[in-house]
């Protein structure tokens, strides 16, 4: 970023509206005010003024707000012009401002980027601005606001501070090996390390929940042919998204539906029936089904209730359960309750949710919808929750791996130097979340996804 650049952009959505806002940030914002308004407004007071063209004619009239730096959103001098929301009027005013030397159109996210570079926001807070704008549910909006107000950053900074204290302790043990107390073997470092690992695990769990709120949960419907998978997809989607017949193997490819349940985003995926393939096309479809299962956030294990009375998934199809990724959540869905006469509703079997329904009639499907909402955290108390992005999850995961490797070095060989290095790497991973340690490349990718005027 050049210190000589003063940027301008429309801060309101394109198109017609009651109000249109142009935002200017940089050292020439003062010159813009004096040129277009004829005066410098009183700081942080709304001033109703005409917006003038170069020949003195009035282009529009509206509210001008002046925020001298560093007490502004970006940390620079900021001017906001709030006029009428017609695109022609805003375009004329924008062209007028751009005639002033040293002014240019802002890049996407450049206002937030400058706020980050001037220490007005950390990187997680800056990302939360875009997440708040893009939020698709009330819970996602509340969580994004929590992140913007620093909830996520505070948790990360607490971990970084704990790692800093632990590193100091470890470095002391390395630098002063002749002390009477062996810091590496007296158990104190191990206890502190375990505390940090436990805190990090808690943050990771909340971050995974926040990622589901932001990006949506990937739910794969899997099971044997003719279990009713496509009928369930149609019931959840509220339309005929998949062809349904009595012929086994009708679905041969992956079908995707993006739906919202009370504003919560879900990616529902219908897959080919799992069995020994009878032809090449079906075999490819089954391979793709397993690929989707391996990447799922949750699997709906669809069971034809007319073929078995079993409810434990390990009893219904042990080979299928054995092949699933470890820790992948499973919901057992016993279908065709309209035929079997089973009592509709939800229960639990060996730690797995069990839902009895009829995909054909729609009976019991609402119970499944509520279950999916709850599994995303919709019904839980998340007043202090925050949104998280995939890069946040990756950074937390890498930090956790370094801490586990450091613990192994400590317990296996009392190798203080190796432990100190793993702690340093974990601290670096966490600092990438808030932007204390990051690359220009990463900043460019993050802020380029923002709105122009943000």
Curated annotation (Swiss-Prot):
EC number(s) given by UniProt? 3.6.-.-
Q: Where does (6S)-5-formyl-5,6,7,8-tetrahydrofolate bind?
A: 23, 80, 120, 454
Q: Which residues does K(+) bind?
A: 226, 245, 247, 250
Keyword terms: Cytoplasm, GTP-binding, Hydrolase, Magnesium, Metal-binding, Nucleotide-binding, Potassium, tRNA processing
Q: Per UniProt, what is one GO molecular function of this protein?
A: GTPase activity
Residues reported in the UniProt entry to bind Mg(2+): 230, 251
Give the protein's biological function. Answer: Exhibits a very high intrinsic GTPase hydrolysis rate. Involved in the addition of a carboxymethylaminomethyl (cmnm) group at the wobble position (U34) of certain tRNAs, forming tRNA-cmnm(5)s(2)U34.
This chain belongs to the protein called: tRNA modification GTPase MnmE
Domain TrmE-type G, first and last residues per copy? 216-377
Name which cysteines form disulfide bonds: none
Instruction: Give GO cellular component annotations, separated by semicolons.
Output: cytosol
| Tree of life domain | Bacteria
- Obligatory cofactor(s): K(+)
State the compartments where it is located.
Cytoplasm
**How is the co-factor bound, per the entry?**
Binds 1 potassium ion per subunit.
């Amino acid at each position: 970023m050049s210190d000589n650049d003063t940027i301008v952009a429309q801060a309101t959505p394109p198109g017609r509206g009651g109000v249109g806002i142009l935002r200017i940030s940089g050292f020439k914002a003062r010159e813009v005010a004096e040129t277009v308004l004829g005066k410098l407004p009183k700081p942080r007071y709304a001033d109703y003024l005409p917006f003038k063209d170069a020949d003195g004619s009035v282009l529009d009239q509206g509210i001008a707000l002046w925020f001298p730096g560093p007490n502004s959103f970006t940390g620079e001098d900021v001017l906001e012009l709030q006029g009428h929301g017609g695109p022609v009027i805003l375009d004329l005013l924008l062209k007028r401002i751009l005639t002033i030397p040293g002014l240019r159109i802002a890049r996407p996210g450049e206002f937030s980027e400058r706020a980050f570079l001037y220490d007005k926001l950390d990187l997680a807070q800056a990302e939360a601005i875009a997440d708040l704008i893009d939020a698709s549910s009330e819970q996602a909006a509340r969580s994004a606001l929590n992140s913007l107000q620093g909830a996520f950053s505070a948790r990360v900074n607490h971990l970084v501070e704990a790692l800093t204290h632990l590193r100091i302790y470890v470095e002391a043990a390395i630098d002063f090996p002749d002390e009477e107390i062996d810091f590496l073997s007296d158990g104190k470092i191990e206890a502190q390390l375990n505390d940090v690992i436990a805190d990090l695990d808690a943050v990771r769990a909340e971050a995974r929940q926040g990622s589901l709120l932001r990006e949506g949960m990937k739910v794969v419907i899997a099971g044997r042919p003719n279990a009713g998978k496509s009928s369930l997809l149609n019931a959840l989607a509220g339309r005929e998204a998949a062809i349904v017949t009595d012929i086994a193997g009708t679905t041969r490819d992956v079908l995707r539906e993006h739906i919202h349940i009370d504003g919560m985003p879900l990616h529902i995926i219908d897959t080919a029936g799992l069995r020994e393939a009878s032809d090449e096309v079906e075999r490819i479809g089954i391979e793709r089904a397993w690929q989707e299962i391996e990447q799922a956030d949750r699997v709906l294990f669809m069971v034809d209730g007319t073929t078995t009375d079993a409810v434990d998934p390990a009893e219904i199809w042990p080979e299928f359960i054995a092949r699933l990724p470890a820790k992948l959540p499973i919901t057992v869905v016993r279908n065709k309750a309209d035929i079997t006469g089973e009592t509709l509703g939800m229960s639990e079997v060996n730690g797995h949710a069990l839902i009895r329904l009829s995909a054909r009639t729609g009976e019991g499907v609402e119970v499944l919808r509520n279950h999916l909402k709850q599994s995303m955290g919709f019904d839980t108390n998340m007043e202090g929750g925050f949104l998280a992005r995939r890069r946040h999850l990756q950074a937390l995961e890498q930090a956790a791996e370094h801490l586990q490797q450091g613990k192994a070095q400590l317990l296996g060989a009392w190798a203080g130097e190796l432990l100190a290095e793993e702690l340093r790497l974990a601290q670096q991973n966490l600092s990438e979340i808030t932007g204390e340690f990051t690359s220009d490349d990463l900043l460019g990718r993050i802020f380029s996804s923002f709105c122009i005027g943000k």
